[in-house]
Amino acid sequence: MCGGLVYPEVPLSSSTAPQAQAPHSSQDSLVAAGGWPFLITAFIGRLPAATVQLGLLLYVSGAGLGLGLAGITVAAVGLGSAVGAPLVGRLVDHFGPLPVVIAATVIQLLSLTAMLAAVVNDGPTALILACAALIGSANPQVGAIARAHWSGLARRRRQPRLITRALGYETACDETSFILGPVIAGLLVGLLGPNPALLTIMAWVIVGQGAFIMYLARHRTEHGAATVEDTAAGGIGKISIAKALPPMMVCLCVGTVFGSTQTALTAVNVLRGTEAYTGVIYGFMGAGSAVASILVSRLPERFPLSLRVAIGASIIGLTCLGLVTLPSTPVIAGLFVIIGVGVGTMLVSSFGRGERIAPSHRIASVMTMLTTCLVLGVSLGAALGGVLSVQPERGFMLTMAAAVVGILASFALHITKPGRLATHQE
């Protein structure tokens, strides 16, 4: 998690896709292609993961263990997710999403239970952090699974424009979940207290991810493991590292923007005594990103992905020139909306390139690789931003540096533009 993509890269021929269906109308909607059950459950299924991370931060600090340990706990969740995401992707490609999502949900619930027991019984810090890492590694990666499903649909239906709209929609869903998840976590801990809140979050995991599991169980034939035909259609099945690195770098830059702006914004509000506004203002970035994700998917095909990334990164860099002056709170909120537009543009473009370079039976693997880079970027941005934000404006300078690297990555995207290898032609 974490759209506007053009999908030229050579349409599937009968030799490369023996199972391809006849082309459908390019105007088919996402609802017609995916169905309401998939759209609803895939959105609900990613909300628990967005709730858990901040929920654990508030839980550990609210339980009296200190904000320092709470921050390290969240870092352990992020590290676990970064390590576990590629493995989850490979397992999904090999076994299909249903058994993987079930196993991940069970591991998450057991780890949350162990963390609750460790905190209540004054367990060692190492145990708490180990539980946090397991919780992160067992993230079922619903967003990546959803993107892989859309890619499969687009390839089977020979509908390049379907994936461009779908990736924009999926990024908007991710951003919406990033807004709603922290709100849900904050309300639960604030209204119920630490221990009841964690129990409620566990129930939320069961309901949210359980809904997606029920959908997968009822549509097993549509969401199975990679078939022999998939492997044949995907060629030798190897992911080109040279072509994968540029979109991975873009995701790393976007994650750094997320992490650095969060720490810099927190530092600004602490300095001004307006800490309560931090989450609200940060949500403006998510709103801008969600809107941009949808709009970018409507851009005409003459705008290549590399140009879109360059424009998105430039928007972020130029906006940071205003942020380093530390303007008033309303102005910062407006600037965060603009940064969100740049972020959304970069995200949908990077995931779009990732989809294009992925063999048919390795799509989930590529999507989770990009998710891993996004998570690592958030951790990098938060860590470096925390050091630099002793003077708040310096945190936004890190954001500006990430934007510059994003512009460089756009050149790499252009140089490594896929040839006649997949379903489209850029």
Question: Where are the language model's segments positioned?
Answer:
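Helix-loop boundary and gating motifs at the non-cytosolic
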Residues: Q21-A82, G234, K238-I281
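C-terminal ends and interior cores of transmembrane alpha-helices
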Residues: V106-D122, I315-P327
